[in-house]
């Protein structure tokens, strides 16, 4: 089954995307998505409405429309479209208002916008991103005392995307260090990392998956051979066990799942931005 899906917002549309995707993931359908942020006025809403209606006329199937919009005028224009429209925030606001006994006070871009109230959190997240970039792939072993977690693993097992996701999503200062082929003859935990053993977390991966990933980068190379991948993964997992470093097999997990599991295993607090 194929459906067109619109994520519409007067802000970034991140909320509409996240909640809409979470709902649609429950259904066995294929989707073509249109994300339309900053639909802030009637003229823009009319243009979006026209786009929705044209797809309906061309396909005969109503597009699915998930929206998060403060302006009543803009909401009503979207609701008059030929799409199957779901106001994902208002559906929760009404019952919550009854429970809290307090009327909502909607403010444009409050969720993902930059305001005086969240400036400190924003600065902390940017600092975490800068830290992750400066300490990616063992570039620098300085200031590891400032790291909240240090990821270890073979090349291409997911360390870099996980470090950056932890920084961007949760403001976690994450460093990462790779074990490369030249290390394997006498693999040991680097002296610079030993004082921070409580911060170390290992990532591993099935050798077959690792070989496929490396093959895309260096085709027909020793680096990408299954034999090499099996050897490296085996050596690094043995190092993790020897040094009692907690680790996770990343093969079947997304970067979001890997990051969340690391926080859970290490007992680290999540911060929302």
UniProtKB/Swiss-Prot annotation:
Pfam families: Kinase-PPPase (PF03618). ADP binds at residues 153-160. This is Putative phosphoenolpyruvate synthase regulatory protein. Disulfide bonds: none annotated. GO terms for molecular function: ADP binding; ATP binding; DNA binding; phosphotransferase activity, phosphate group as acceptor; protein serine/threonine kinase activity. Bifunctional serine/threonine kinase and phosphorylase involved in the regulation of the phosphoenolpyruvate synthase (PEPS) by catalyzing its phosphorylation/dephosphorylation. It comes from the Bacteria. GO terms for biological process: regulation of DNA-templated transcription. Belongs to the pyruvate, phosphate/water dikinase regulatory protein family. PSRP subfamily. It comes from Yersinia pestis. InterPro entries: Kinase-pyrophosphorylase, PSRP, TF_DNA-bd_sf. Keywords: Kinase, Nucleotide-binding, Serine/threonine-protein kinase, Transferase. Its EC number is 2.7.11.33, 2.7.4.28. It catalyses: [pyruvate, water dikinase] + ADP = [pyruvate, water dikinase]-phosphate + AMP + H(+); [pyruvate, water dikinase]-phosphate + phosphate + H(+) = [pyruvate, water dikinase] + diphosphate.
């Amino acid at each position: 089954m194929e459906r067109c899906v619109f994520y519409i917002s007067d802000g970034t549309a991140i909320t509409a995307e996240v909640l809409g995707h979470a709902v649609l993931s429950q259904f066995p359908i294929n989707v073509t998505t249109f994300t339309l942020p900053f639909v802030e006025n009637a003229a823009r809403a009319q243009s979006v409405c026209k786009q929705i209606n044209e797809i309906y006329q061309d396909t005969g199937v109503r597009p699915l429309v998930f929206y998060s919009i403060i302006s009543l005028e803009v909401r009503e224009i979207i609701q008059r479209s030929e799409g199957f429209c779901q106001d994902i925030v208002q559906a929760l606001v009404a019952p919550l208002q009854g429970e809290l006994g307090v009327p909502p006070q909607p403010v444009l871009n409050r969720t993902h916008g930059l305001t005086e109230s969240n400036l400190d959190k924003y600065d902390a997240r940017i600092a975490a991103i800068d830290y992750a970039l400066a300490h990616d792939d063992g570039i620098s072993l300085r200031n590891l005392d400032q790291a909240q977690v240090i990821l270890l693993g073979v090349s291409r097992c997911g360390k870099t995307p996980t470090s950056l996701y932890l920084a961007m999503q949760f403001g976690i200062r994450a460093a990462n260090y790779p074990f490369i082929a030249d290390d394997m003859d006498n693999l040991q935990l680097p002296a610079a990392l030993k004082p921070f053993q409580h911060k170390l977390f290992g990532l591993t991966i099935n050798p077959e998956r690792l070989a496929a990933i490396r093959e895309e980068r260096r085709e027909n190379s020793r680096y990408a051979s299954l034999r090499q991948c099996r050897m490296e993964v085996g050596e690094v997992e043995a190092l993790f066990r020897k040094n009692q470093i907690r680790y996770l097999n990343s093969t079947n997990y997304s970067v979001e799942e890997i990051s969340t599991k690391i926080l859970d295993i290490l007992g680290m607090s999540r911060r929302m931005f």
